[in-house]
Amino acid sequence: MDPEQNDTKPPFNPICATRQAPYSHEILENLDITGILLFAILTFMTLVSLLVFLEEAYYMYRKIPNPKNSIIIWINAGAMMIATTSCFGMWIPRSTMFTDFTASVFLAVLIHKFQLMLVNECGGRREFLSTFGDTKLKISTGPFCCCCLCLPHKDINRKTLFILKLGTFQFAFLRPVLMFLAVVLWTNGTYMIGNSSAEKATIWINIGVGITTITALWAVGIMFNLVKDNLKEKNIIGKFAVYQFTVILSQLQTSIINILGTTGVISCVPPLPGPSRASYMNQQLLIMEMFLVTVICRVLYRRRYDDKNLLENQETNDNLRNSMMHLNGKALEDGPQSV
């Protein structure tokens, strides 16, 4: 009776036990027509995102002066880089740690640059301090202290602005450092995705990443609540919504799907074990989502500057024309005298 029952059970695949990501050729060999079409469409969407960003970066570089153009280019690069790294991770599953490291670096810089853009759109640091110098800063905002309504309001001065900038700069610095440490420990087997035991470094690195992330988001939230009424005509609410959308999808969505993969909710389907299949699904979702974010960013940031640049170019041409007329008139007056 027992041998017959054993014959009816499906054979156990060792891939599900090792939980090791497959090589790229193993993925490609197991693709059906639907999988091939999906790979082609997602790769095409990634290429379109890259081309849209390059065109937008060229436009910003030519039309907008420094340092505003570099800040906006960095912000627009975030979604494109997440889509690109996700595409590489989809094609090469074993590169997930390295693609996640690259995406996290760009995300950290994106959050810091977005806060700098809020100050820059107010006219710079001096204009920002003169505009909001008499305003009290509300620090009981999400995601860190939204429930602590009893927190006092702070005066806005150079020290306050420096602390807010430090809140995002620490994330731009520490997040790449922590992810680099995770990659190094992963090669040694000390860092394992989904392993929450205290003996492994995974849980401690994840706690550090979580603290730095929440602190940076808190600083940006405080700054946004302060300037949003003054920057409504500059589409700042839409830009902030897209920024939040990018952060939530690249962080919260990824964490939830990875937890589902490590707990077995997303099951093993050879050649992909559970955690690798979860990363595989998340990468495909991120490509589609970041494609939409790239297109929306182009609309928001491009439309904002078209009319302004047109007026600036007209003013520059008028000033140049007036200067040339003045120089020509002066030359005609001075010519006979010099002779």
Swiss-Prot record:
Glycosylation, residue list: 6, 188, 195
A Pfam short name: Solute_trans_a
Highest taxon above the source species: Eukaryota
GO molecular function: protein heterodimerization activity; protein homodimerization activity
Extracellular compartment spans: 1-32, 92-97, 187-202, 276-283
GO BP, sorted A to Z: bile acid and bile salt transport
Subcellular location: Cell membrane; Endoplasmic reticulum membrane
Spans within the Cytoplasmic topological domain: 54-70, 119-165, 224-254, 302-339
Annotated GO CC locations: endoplasmic reticulum membrane; membrane; plasma membrane; protein-containing complex
Keywords for the protein's UniProt record, in alphabetical order: Cell membrane, Endoplasmic reticulum, Glycoprotein, Lipid transport, Membrane, Transmembrane, Transmembrane helix, Transport
Keyword Transmembrane helix: yes
UniProt catalytic activity: taurocholate(out) = taurocholate(in); prostaglandin E2(out) = prostaglandin E2(in); estrone 3-sulfate(out) = estrone 3-sulfate(in); dehydroepiandrosterone 3-sulfate(out) = dehydroepiandrosterone 3-sulfate(in)
Membrane topology, as annotated: Multi-pass membrane protein
Membrane-spanning segments: 33-53, 71-91, 98-118, 166-186, 203-223, 255-275, 284-301
Entry's family note: Belongs to the OST-alpha family.
Assembly and interaction partners: Interacts with slc51b. The Ost-alpha/Ost-beta complex is a heterodimer composed of alpha (slc51a) and beta (slc51b) subunit.
Role summary: Essential component of the Ost-alpha/Ost-beta complex, a heterodimer that acts as the intestinal basolateral transporter responsible for the translocation of bile acids (such as taurocholate), steroids (such as estrone sulfate), and eicosanoids (such as prostaglandin E2).
PANTHER family for this protein: ORGANIC SOLUTE TRANSPORTER-RELATED (PTHR23423)
The name this protein goes by in its record: Organic solute transporter subunit alpha
Organism in which the protein naturally occurs: Xenopus tropicalis (Western clawed frog)
